[in-house]
Amino acid sequence: MQLKKNDLINLTIEDMSSEGEGIGKADGFTFFVKDAIIGDSIVARVTKLKKTYGYARLEKIVEPSEFRVEAPCAFHKQCGGCQIQAMDYKKQLEFKENKVFNNLVRIGGFSADFIEKIMEPIVGMDNPYRYRNKAQFPIGKRKVCGEDGSEKWEVIAGFYAGRTHHIIANTDCLLGVTENQEILETFLVYMTENRVSAYDEETCRGLVRHLLIRKGFASGEIMVCVVINGDKLPAEDKLISLLSGIRGVVSLSVSINKENTNVIMGKKIRTIWGKDKIKDTIRILNGEDFSETGDSVEFAISPLSFYQVNPVQTEKLYSLALSYAGLKGKETVWDLYCGIGTISLFLAKRAKKVYGVEIVADAIRDAKENAVNNGIDNAEFFVGKAEEVLPDFYEKEVAAGRSATADVIVVDPPRKGCDAMCLDTILKMQPKRVVYVSCDSATLARDLKILCEGGYELKKVRAVDQFAHTGHVETVVLLSQQKPDDYIEVELELDEMDLTTAESKATYKEIQEYVLKEHGLKVSNLYISQVKRKCGIIERENYNKPKSEDAKQPFCPEDKEMAIKDALEHFGMI
């Protein structure tokens, strides 16, 4: 029988999607079911059908999974924030680790055996609740029945239901800090008593759109920012009196956003009481066991600052990235997509020089301020797209006859991953190590494939759970210049007795220096050897032979081949 919409189907959930939907198969279709977890046997109702897959709504759990737990939040099924709260936390970690593993194999093209060998255990949370230092609550209204039976409107705050803009009223999200509830409920009282209207997305009328709350976990300082569809809040003095009395609140501001847009924050921020920014401190931990090192970096955070929302896991994430960078104090490092300089300032504590690049000008201003506040003078920041700033730097340095290389390049791109031009320039600069911090393992796998095809070897992979009870996972990866066992080792000293006349005219080092100066390219001894053979220059019998008969050798790219030939002509070798 042909399946159709509204049909009931029996499913056993065998896997989960990246968005946390349960995946099961029926009648040749793969179905995605919200609120179902691995191991559940369910009855679901078909809601949408495509050619080979479809979506279904959970109707009944026939046999619950051994990994199913009682979710502590009564709103988790309605709210779009927690997709997998009903799954045991250990199983959540396994699911996320498998997600990274499978993407590296399926998209990256790496062998499962290889990834299994280099992948380190996922870094989970000690407490997977109350971890968010920032929350943006939409403000709306709903009809309620009064004591006399009449209907009236009341203002509400909460979160949007999944894939909608319908507000689920909830002032105590279990992922947020406990102070959120008192602040929200106090703010709603202020709105009710002073007849402050809530913004209506359909009519674009009403004043209050969102309430942003941020907390510095280390400092205890709390910032409250009201996003309004106007220029001023009524009775600001009353709001200040109410909120300033809440423990920890040190900053009250207004964000003006009159645009008909889904963007939450407006560009203009006005502080109405207290500080313009709050402070927080991120500790630098030992990257091996996350023990204390006694070192840290302090950050000033504004309502618009990009700052990781889980500070406890951020310490582990960035300390791991710092450990992978392998800094000894003499390195030049580039930090691409640097935000307010969180990773940059970590790196600057261990490197000789750090260059940070970020497209958001306000973030770069914050980065520079944070560097000054921490007494860091070896970090320099640039406003612009990574795919424009890095290539521009490279081309200018090469044109001036200077080395355009870096010892380490760190990237922490958005979900779409690194731009192709950015990856191309990284390959041209040939850093000794590349550290990739990713928030999307699918685009990570795609980019790693490009970097490894360009001469890098994947050395370490480790997932970090930044967002418990959601389908999202961060990943830190280390790549180094390719020197696996099945590639040849090259000696720099030549046996003069075995040299041909052509070989004696220039050493490999001289050829490399010429190519770097004239073409801005770094070439390996292997590439030079391959081009020399093509040009009829006979090498010594034992030179550049692989260690084993089935060893793979990378072939010289066309641009580097032309540059090497130019060098050979320059030295009169061809």
What are these regions (language model features)?
Residues K505, Q553-I574:
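Phospho-regulated, low-complexity intrinsically disordered regions of nuclear gene-regulatory
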Residues E539-E549:
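Short Lys/Arg-enriched helix C-cap and helix-to-coil transition segments
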Residues Q2-N10, S18, D231-E503, Y508-K509:
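Rossmann-like S-adenosyl-L-methionine
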Residues L212-G216, I222-K232:
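Carbohydrate-binding surface patches
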Residues E59-A71, K77-A198, L233:
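Extended interfacial segments that mediate partner engagement and assembly in macromolecular machines
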Residues T507-H519, S529-C535:
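DNA-recognition alpha helix
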Residues M1-F75, E380-F381, E388:
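Terminal RNA-binding accessory module
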